[in-house]
Amino acid sequence: MLENGDAFECGQTFFVYEEHAGGEAGALPPGSVELGCQSFHPGLLAAWSALARVAPTRVPVVLQGETGTGKELAARALHVWSGRAGPFVAVNCGALPEPLAESELFGVRRGAYTGASEDRPGLVRASSGGTLLLDEVGELPPGVQVKLLRVLQENEVAPVGSPQPVRVDLRVVAATHRDLEGLVEAGTFRRDLFARLTGLEVELPPLRERRGDLGLLVPALLRRAGAPAGLQFSREAMRALFRWEWPHNVRELEKALALSVALAGGGRVELDHLPEPVRSAPEPTPEAPADPSTLSAADLERRTRLIALLREHGGNISAVARQMGVARMQIQRWCRRFQVDPASFRAA
C-alpha cells in the first residue's frame, strides 16, 4: 500500500504519491512563479496563499521551518506581494557578532566607540519603506531584543551613540528553525517581543515531505547552475534524487545539482556524479514507530505540535489534518510513528 510521499516508477516516468486534504489553497498573485512559488504540496500552497492574503496588511508574520526550506524566498515573495516600495533586506541574526549586533541592526553614530569612524544607518533604517527579514530571530542577544521591541512599538530606531531616535516605516518578518515559544518559556527570548512578532505563523515543510516538487525544483535549479539545455539524467541518478531524504532541504539539492553538472562536463548526469551520501542512500523501508527519545529536534517539534492539536480538537484527526494542511492519512502515519494515540484525547 502506498503511503503519502512514496516515489515509484512507471515506464520512463517517476511519480510521487501525495494525499491532499480537502479544500483549495487559493490562487497566488500574478508573477508568483517567477518568484519561485511553485509547488504541488497542499501545505506549502496554503502557506503561500496565506502570506499573499496578509501581505498588504500590517499583520506580523513568523516563518518556521528547517534550514533550507525557503524561508527567505517566502519572505521575499511577501515583500513583493505587499507592494511596499522600499527594499527587501535579509539578515541572519545567528551570524551577527554579538558585540556588533546593535550597530549592525540599529546603526551607529561616528565616535560612539573605538573604530566607529563614520555614521552608519544600520539595517533597520536601510529597510525603511520596505521589509526586514530577521532570519534565525531566536539567536538575537537579550540587549538587541530590547531595542528591537522599541522599534516595533514606537516605529523609531536609536543608533548607537545617538540620543536622537529616527522614525522608520518597515515591516519586520521573523524566521526561525527553533521553537520560539519554547525559548520564551526557557527565558532566552522576551515574551513581549514574541507577542509583537507573532501574528500569522507559517510552517514551511521540509523537502522530504514534498518529493513531488522535485520535478519543478530540479529544472529551475539546473538553470541556476548554468546547466546546458536539455541536460539528461540517468535513471539511476534520478532514482537517487527521489530516494534521498534531503536533510538540508532545497539548499542541499541545489549544491548536489551544481556538483553533478560540473562533474558531468556537459554530458548526461550519471549516478557517480552525485554526492556520495545521495548516491548511496538505501532503498526506503516501511517506517517503524520511533522511540521519542531518539527523535530529531524537528520531529520532536512536530510531535509536540501534533499532540497539542489533538488535545485542542479532542482527538479529531480530520480537524488536525485541516489545520496542519495535510491529509488525514498523514496524521495517522505521524501518530503511528510518534507513538501518539488520538483516542486518548477524546472525551469518554
Where are these regions (language model features)?
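Conserved post-Walker A coupling segment in P-loop NTPases
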Residues: 50-115, 125-141, 169, 206-212, ...
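C-terminal boundary/linker segments immediately following FHA domains
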Residues: 1-40
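Nucleotide-binding/hydrolysis machinery
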Residues: 66, 75, 82-86, 143-145, ...
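A short beta-strand-to-loop transition that corresponds to the Sensor-1 phosphate-sensing loop
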Residues: 13, 136, 174-179
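N-terminal pre-P-loop "Q-motif" helix
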Residues: 36-50, 298
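Bacterial C-terminal helix-turn-helix
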Residues: 9, 255, 290-348
